[in-house]
Amino acid sequence: LTPPKLGPIEIRVTTIRTGKSVTFLQFEMTQNSEVVLVATGSWASINEGIESPQIMIPEVPGPEDCPVPTRITDSPTRLHEKWEIRSVNQALSASFENNNSRMQWWIRPKETTPMSSSLIVAAADALPPPIFFQSDKIKMAPTIDLTIHVRVDIDSVQWNGASWLLAEFVTNHASGGFIEEDGLIWDDAEELKQLAALSHPKP
């Protein structure tokens, strides 16, 4: 709803409904008595059932073979200072910026951070929309809506300080001053972690 500032926050969690296998929660973050974020979440237990094929991780150079991106945003941001980021597209082509609506990145926190659903959500929202690299007109695109589907049992993930996540995002649609972006994230053990759909306003 509005960007929070550095400082104390309060988070209120409300259980909307609890069923046999799914629990629905609502989160409200406030700062200085102002609501800055509202989120809803659905937590489901893992059950036996139909298993369709996984979306396979793309064959791309490893993070050690990918450079630090030459441009994330026009100016450094506090958000990007928290992450190590490597550009797969730059490793594959020096001219990707002008003609690619699909971007691939290796990303991990600079500080050792335990694997969690919160980490996956943060990684999904840490990278700029691919359309940034197609147009110089877009300088900022704050997220107004973010949907994440976590596709793995977090407790089963092998994760340490040297681990990376591979993120792939594509700008599928832009109109009326808004950008729609879809993404996938895998860990470096090649397991799909999340599907993301983001909406950004275009200044």
Named regions from a protein language model:
Residues 1-203:
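Terminal targeting signals and extreme-terminal segments of soluble enzymes
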